[in-house]
């Protein structure tokens, strides 16, 4: 099963498991003077380009929006809606995890900070240059999905 994992944010972490686990970060920050909607347009374009490059995607998994600051939660929720529409248009299954689920699975603690998650990802994949916590979260979420779906 080909799975794309997304940690949705202005700097969206992604991870993919075919032919072997790989990942990166997509910068969705709009250019100065652009509308805020450009973030959603960039995400849709990145998803389409990624699918065109890899071919088939069976499942997209993403982190559910959560947090204390409503503006950030709303921004991520808007990105989630882009992912859902993309999946519906392309016939791709999708699911999500709460941040605490991912943290507890990866570190044993549901309230682990970004540094701990980054350390955990680097321990699991020393051969991969994990550039930030967004990529780390996407990689760990992918591993969790593989474990849940026994891939």
Named regions from a protein language model:
Residues 1-151:
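Phosphate- and other anionic-substrate recognition elements at nucleic-acid/protein interfaces
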């Amino acid at each position: 099963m080909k799975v794309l994992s997304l940690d949705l944010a202005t700097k969206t972490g992604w991870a993919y498991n075919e032919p072997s686990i790989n990942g990166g970060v997509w910068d969705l920050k709009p250019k100065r003077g652009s509308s805020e909607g450009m973030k959603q347009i960039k995400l849709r374009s990145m998803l389409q380009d990624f699918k065109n490059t890899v071919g088939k995607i069976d499942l997209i998994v993403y982190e559910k929006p959560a947090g204390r600051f409503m503006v950030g939660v709303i921004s991520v929720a808007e990105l989630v809606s882009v992912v859902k529409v993309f999946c519906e248009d392309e016939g791709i299954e999708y699911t999500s995890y709460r941040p605490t689920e991912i943290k507890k699975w990866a570190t044993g603690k549901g309230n682990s900070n970004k540094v701990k998650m980054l350390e955990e990802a680097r321990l699991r994949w020393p051969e991969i240059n994990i550039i930030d916590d967004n990529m780390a979260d996407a990689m760990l979420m992918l591993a969790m999905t593989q474990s849940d779906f026994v891939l």
